[in-house]
Amino acid sequence: MSIRVIIAGFKGKMGQAACQMVLTDPDLDLVAVLDPFESESEWQGIPVFKDKADLAGFEADVWVDFTTPAVAYENTRFALENGFAPVVGTTGFTSEEIAELKEFSRAQDLGGLIAPNFALGAVLLMQFATQAAKYFPNVEIIELHHDKKKDAPSGTAIKTAELMAEVRESIQQGAADEEELIAGARGADFDGMRIHSVRLPGLVAHQEVIFGNQGEGLTLRHDSYDRISFMTGVNLGIKEVVKRHELVYGLEHLL
């Protein structure tokens, strides 16, 4: 039996890529799409909804969300309330929101996934960086994205920093008496690690994790050149959350 999928934010670039992926997979069935600004009632024969409230009681298994940080939490909560296992690629969640959604998913006995990055290479980068941070506590992150991305730093950069902080010696990166001649020049501070965000046209999603030690350096980098790189992870997420009974944060928990 096919997994019935709703895609919220289907008009965006990630939403469109997700739609095409679902439409070409015989194990998945795209049953509805959501966008508050869409004027048509159908898209490729699929019903279009402008208000998520109209999807209450709709028959579907999975809610895929590529919307905006402003509505992502509300959408994920709505999905869980209505029996849809959420697969969320929208970033901008606070740690408190993630914890609350995990608890609510357990109460609803529903699986779910919030993933800062669906590219398998990016997930591996985070794992490699976590291993390296045990031995190289001096580290900075540079994340680079297209200039339409609204949140900074990226969810991937934050997740990477969180994972490294679990194993890394907590030290302040840089000189103790350093002075920023322009505010923000040293980037965001996460447990002593610095995170730098680049936003330029032509980019998709890229990240470097740079480690330094006496007389040596180590650089880990991942590049997504096309949004199709995320679809393997989205596909995996859809097929896995229907088997689970709790929401997880990070694709690595489903691998």
Curated annotation (Swiss-Prot):
Binding positions (NAD(+)): G9, F10, K11, G12, K13, M14, D35, G89, T90, T91, A115, P116, N117, F118
Localization terms from the record: Cytoplasm
EC number(s) given by UniProt: 1.17.1.8
A GO cellular component annotation in the UniProt record: cytosol
Broad enzyme group: oxidoreductase
Binding sites annotated in the UniProt record for (S)-2,3,4,5-tetrahydrodipicolinate: H146, G155, T156
UniProt entry keywords in alphabetical sequence: Amino-acid biosynthesis, Cytoplasm, Diaminopimelate biosynthesis, Lysine biosynthesis, NAD, NADP, Oxidoreductase
Active-site residues annotated for this sequence: H145 (proton donor/acceptor), K149 (proton donor)
InterPro entries assigned: DapB_C, DapB_N, DapB_N_CS, DHDPR_bac, NAD(P)-bd_dom_sf
A biological process from GO: lysine biosynthetic process via diaminopimelate
Gene3D superfamilies: Dihydrodipicolinate Reductase, domain 2, NAD(P)-binding Rossmann-like Domain
Catalytic activity from the UniProt record: (S)-2,3,4,5-tetrahydrodipicolinate + NAD(+) + H2O = (2S,4S)-4-hydroxy-2,3,4,5-tetrahydrodipicolinate + NADH + H(+); (S)-2,3,4,5-tetrahydrodipicolinate + NADP(+) + H2O = (2S,4S)-4-hydroxy-2,3,4,5-tetrahydrodipicolinate + NADPH + H(+)
Pfam families, A to Z: DapB_C, DapB_N
GO molecular function, a single term: NAD binding
Record-annotated disulphide pairs: none
Pathway in which the depicted protein is active: Amino-acid biosynthesis; L-lysine biosynthesis via DAP pathway; (S)-tetrahydrodipicolinate from L-aspartate: step 4/4
HAMAP family referenced in this protein's UniProt entry, alphabetically: DapB
Physiological role: Catalyzes the conversion of 4-hydroxy-tetrahydrodipicolinate (HTPA) to tetrahydrodipicolinate.
Listed PANTHER family: 4-HYDROXY-TETRAHYDRODIPICOLINATE REDUCTASE 1, CHLOROPLASTIC-RELATED, DIHYDRODIPICOLINATE REDUCTASE
Name of this chain's protein: 4-hydroxy-tetrahydrodipicolinate reductase
Protein's organism: Streptococcus pneumoniae serotype 4 (strain ATCC BAA-334 / TIGR4)
